[in-house]
Amino acid sequence: MSTRSVTHSTFVVERVYDADPARVFHAFADPEAKSRWFTHPDDWVSDAGTMDFRVGGRETVSGGPKGGPVHSFSSIYQDIVLNERIVYTYDMHMDDIRTSVSLATIELFPSGAGTRLVMTEQGAFLDGYDDAGSREEGTKLLLDALGAALASEPAGA
């Protein structure tokens, strides 16, 4: 029998965007808008994914470098407050191996003419396949990509 392990970790990432909370919320809630920033490295291949943005709805996406392994994200939306909060649980797999299970909370606060986003993630990283440092770094990269997507679109988009 192999040795099993779980490592728990919590991290918080904050960003301020020059976009009002409704625009930032839309970037999470609308599949087309989310596809502009919630993405993978350029050299990866991925499926089209699915997104049902409502409490109890699911979102899935998978992909990886050509030739594998395949990384899969599967989430369930637990709580949604329009333009204020999104709470979801998700797990990550690498091929058929579950690597982590997480609870993520996104909070949006007005900040001048923009938005302060606070993302808190509580994760259980399983059997050494993933770690909090890598997840936090990936989250920061995604939130930076969100900022770039918001900055590249006109406010009415």
Regions found by a protein language model. Give the residues of each.
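Hydrophobic ligand-binding cavity/cleft-lining segments
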Residues: 1-45
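Short beta-edge strand/loop motif at the mouth of beta-sheet-based domains
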Residues: 12, 32-70, 157
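A short, structured loop/turn motif at beta-sheet edges
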Residues: 21-22, 53-54, 78-85, 107-116
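Helix-adjacent hinge/juxtasegments
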Residues: 58-82, 86-88
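Short, highly charged C-terminal tails/helix-capping segments
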Residues: 148-157
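Hydrophobic/aromatic beta-strand elements that line small-molecule binding cavities or substrate pockets
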Residues: 15, 49, 73-79, 102-109
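Hydrophobic pocket/interface hotspot
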Residues: 24, 34, 59, 77, ...
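Beta-strand/loop substructures that line and gate deep hydrophobic ligand-binding cavities in soluble
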Residues: 87-89, 93-141
